[in-house]
Swiss-Prot record:
<dbReference type="InterPro" id="IPR040442">
    <property type="entry name" value="Pyrv_kinase-like_dom_sf"/>
</dbReference>
<feature type="binding site">
    <location>
        <position position="110"/>
    </location>
    <ligand>
        <name>3-methyl-2-oxobutanoate</name>
    </ligand>
</feature>
<feature type="binding site">
    <location>
        <position position="81"/>
    </location>
    <ligand>
        <name>Mg(2+)</name>
    </ligand>
</feature>
<keyword id="KW-0963">Cytoplasm</keyword>
<dbReference type="InterPro" id="IPR015813">
    <property type="entry name" value="Pyrv/PenolPyrv_kinase-like_dom"/>
</dbReference>
<keyword id="KW-0479">Metal-binding</keyword>
<feature type="binding site">
    <location>
        <begin position="42"/>
        <end position="43"/>
    </location>
    <ligand>
        <name>3-methyl-2-oxobutanoate</name>
    </ligand>
</feature>
<dbReference type="GO" id="GO:0005737">
    <property type="term" value="C:cytoplasm"/>
</dbReference>
<keyword id="KW-0460">Magnesium</keyword>
<feature type="binding site">
    <location>
        <position position="112"/>
    </location>
    <ligand>
        <name>Mg(2+)</name>
    </ligand>
</feature>
<feature type="binding site">
    <location>
        <position position="81"/>
    </location>
    <ligand>
        <name>3-methyl-2-oxobutanoate</name>
    </ligand>
</feature>
<comment type="similarity">
    <text>Belongs to the PanB family.</text>
</comment>
<comment type="function">
    <text>Catalyzes the reversible reaction in which hydroxymethyl group from 5,10-methylenetetrahydrofolate is transferred onto alpha-ketoisovalerate to form ketopantoate.</text>
</comment>
<dbReference type="InterPro" id="IPR003700">
    <property type="entry name" value="Pantoate_hydroxy_MeTrfase"/>
</dbReference>
<feature type="binding site">
    <location>
        <position position="42"/>
    </location>
    <ligand>
        <name>Mg(2+)</name>
    </ligand>
</feature>
<dbReference type="GO" id="GO:0000287">
    <property type="term" value="F:magnesium ion binding"/>
</dbReference>
<protein>
    <recommendedName>
        <fullName>3-methyl-2-oxobutanoate hydroxymethyltransferase</fullName>
        <ecNumber>2.1.2.11</ecNumber>
    </recommendedName>
</protein>
Length: 277
């Protein structure tokens, strides 16, 4: 049964909400069985396309990856990030968010920002588009924030984040991501806000957690401090590639068990030449 935003909200204070990012059909199919929420994050720009930041990610890219993820899910709620500069007015936000929902079949969109995007969030929610908020460290704002740094360390910054989170909730966001803020601030916001908080580098005090799946799986040697690597796929993949190349060079692969024999199997192969492509 597909989860909806009410199911996610009902977990607040009762059951931790497990979230991960996904950008492809195979990965989403694996995550769907276990995760409550899958985010098609604009982090795809860095993890898949090798971009320096999320600022170059386009709406078409998000829609393409959103389609792939939605096709794989049978249970998890799917949220798609709205990319940089795609929601700087209420009308533009609605135009792009409605396209994301209609073309991907996802359940909600995510916007970064607090007070500055409250009007856009309210505009979308009033027109039937569920919104996930995102405050604290906001990757689309990294130039203004002076880089990827923990936020809320000063009294003024702490107050600013609290105002942002409150504005997002009052505008109608069904949950809010808290990124790279202190544990005490995360605990305070989780207690005060009426909607679930999803932490990333924001301590275990939040109602749920999210990580970039590539970081969690250890597919890169570079990852933030707040990431726990539950696997080491970078070395697993390297070992597999080395083994494959060695087997090819030594003529150990393909073996007889990987080859077609004369007879019916050969006729099938010739009738379906696309198998060789």
């Amino acid at each position: 049964m597909l989860l909806n935003i009410l199911d996610i909200q009902a977990k607040k204070g009762l059951e931790k909400i497990a979230c991960l990012t996904a950008y492809t059909f195979p990965m989403a199919r694996i995550l769907d069985e276990h995760c409550d929420l899958i985010l098609v994050g604009d982090s795809v720009g860095q993890t898949v396309y090798g971009m320096e930041s999320t600022l170059s990610v386009t709406l078409d890219m998000m829609i393409a990856h959103g389609k792939a993820v939605v096709k794989a899910r049978s249970k998890a709620l799917v949220v798609v990030d709205m990319p940089f500069a795609s929601y700087y007015t209420p009308e533009l936000a609605y135009k792009n968010a409605s396209r994301i929902l209609s073309e991907t079949g996802c359940d909600a969109v995510k916007l970064e920002g607090g007070v500055c995007v409250a009007e856009e969030i309210a505009f979308l929610v009033a027109r039937g588009i569920p919104v996930m908020g995102h405050v604290g460290l906001m990757p689309q704002h990294f130039n203004q924030l002076g880089g990827y740094k923990c936020q809320g360390k000063t009294d003024s910054s702490r107050q600013h984040i609290k105002e942002d989170a409150k504005a997002v909730c009052e505008a109608g966001a069904f949950c809010v991501v808290l990124e790279c803020i202190s544990p005490s601030l995360a605990a305070e916001l989780t207690q005060e806000l009426p909607v679930p908080t999803i932490g990333i580098g924001a301590s275990n005090a939040c109602d749920g957690q999210i990580l970039v799946v590539d970081d969690m799986l250890g597919q890169s040697s570079r990852y933030p401090k707040f990431v726990k690597r539950f696997a080491d796929l970078e070395h697993t993949i390297k070992d597999a590639v080395v083994g494959y190349v060695r087997a090819v060079k030594c003529s150990e692969f393909p073996g007889d068990e990987h080859c077609y024999s004369d007879g019916p199997h050969l006729r099938v192969f010739r009738a379906h030449p696309h198998h060789a492509q």
